[in-house]
Curated annotation (Swiss-Prot):
Keywords tagged on the record: Metal-binding, Zinc
Protein name (record): DNA gyrase inhibitor YacG
GO BP: regulation of DNA-templated transcription
Gene behind the chain: yacG
Cofactor note: Binds 1 zinc ion.
Stated family: Belongs to the DNA gyrase inhibitor YacG family.
Amino-acid positions noted as binding Zn(2+) in the UniProt annotation, renumbered to this chain: C7, C10, C26, C30
Pfam families with a match to the protein in the record: YacG
Required cofactor names: Zn(2+)
Organism: Shewanella pealeana (strain ATCC 700345 / ANG-SQ1)
Subunit (UniProt): Interacts with GyrB.
HAMAP family in the cross-refs: DNA_gyrase_inhibitor_YacG
Role according to the record: Inhibits all the catalytic activities of DNA gyrase by preventing its interaction with DNA. Acts by binding directly to the C-terminal domain of GyrB, which probably disrupts DNA binding by the gyrase.
Top-level taxon: Bacteria
Length: 79
């Protein structure tokens, strides 16, 4: 028994079985359109930031030497 789903791009009915080459898409064209949407960030998975962006400003993250001054892997002799 096969399942029928809608193509995520154009909503055309697609039979979901082993022979469906582009599942869940109806065609390579729809598959590539979807890929392009992800690549251009038109599609995105929403993520809540773990911290407030204002904290980066308070830490001096925007200063040019932030990473140079806070590198734990570099000792003062290598500068």
């Amino acid at each position: 028994m096969s399942l029928t789903v809608k193509c995520p791009t154009c909503q055309t009915p697609v039979t979901w079985n082993a022979e469906a080459e582009f599942k869940p898409f109806c065609s390579e064209r729809c598959k590539l359109i979807d890929l392009g949407d992800w690549a251009s960030e038109k599609n995105a998975i929403p993520v809540k930031p773990e911290f407030a962006p204002e904290l980066l400003d308070q830490l001096g993250y925007d200063d040019a030497d932030f990473f140079l001054d806070n590198n734990p892997f570099e000792d003062d002799k290598n500068r």
